[in-house]
């Protein structure tokens, strides 16, 4: 159990940087549950600032979407997450939501990044297809035992568990 701060329903895109940093601090003062901060944005410097704020407040991890304005090729996605993986100083997750970003972080890329970055702890796969998430579970298991695959839709919670995934982040 834990809390995801500033997910899609949290309307993070409508908040200023200062508001997002303030929320990161305020949420920590309100609960001792594990916290994950969505640090997605269109500027790497802002994303790094948000991640640093979350880590300094003791957040369990941060989560990031692919760039959500310009759809990216698989090669561009890999370069993007390589850059983020080098900047994030703590645990992090990828938030895969192709309906909102126009691109899909597929199982092969997830496995490649999981092998490359020990602090890359998991993925929230918000895809309306249980077999997509199952493919990520299988690919990640080939390279890491400690990698977490979470579905993003409640109705896939049980199928995700049955396929070896770790639950839902909703």
Can you say where each PLM-predicted feature lies in the sequence?
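Active-site beta->alpha loop and helix N-cap motifs at the rims of alpha/beta catalytic domains
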Residues: 1-104
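Catalytic alpha/beta core domains of metabolic enzymes, predominantly
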Residues: 87, 99-170
């Amino acid at each position: 159990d834990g809390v995801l701060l500033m997910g899609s329903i949290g309307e993070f895109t409508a908040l200023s940087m200062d508001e997002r940093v303030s929320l990161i601090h305020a949420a920590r003062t309100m609960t001792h549950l594990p916290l994950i901060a969505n640090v997605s944005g269109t500027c790497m410097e802002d994303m790094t600032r948000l991640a640093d704020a979350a880590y300094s407040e003791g957040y369990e991890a941060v989560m990031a979407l692919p760039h959500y304005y310009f759809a990216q090729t698989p090669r561009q996605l890999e370069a993007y997450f390589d850059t983020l993986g080098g900047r994030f100083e703590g645990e992090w997750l990828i938030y895969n939501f192709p309906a909102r970003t126009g691109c899909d972080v597929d199982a092969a890329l997830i496995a490649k990044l999981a092998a490359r970055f020990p602090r890359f702890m998991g993925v929230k796969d918000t895809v309306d297809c249980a077999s997509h998430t199952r493919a990520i579970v299988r690919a990640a298991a080939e390279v890491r035992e400690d990698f977490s695959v979470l579905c993003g839709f409640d109705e896939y919670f049980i199928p995700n568990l049955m396929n070896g995934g770790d639950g839902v982040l909703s």
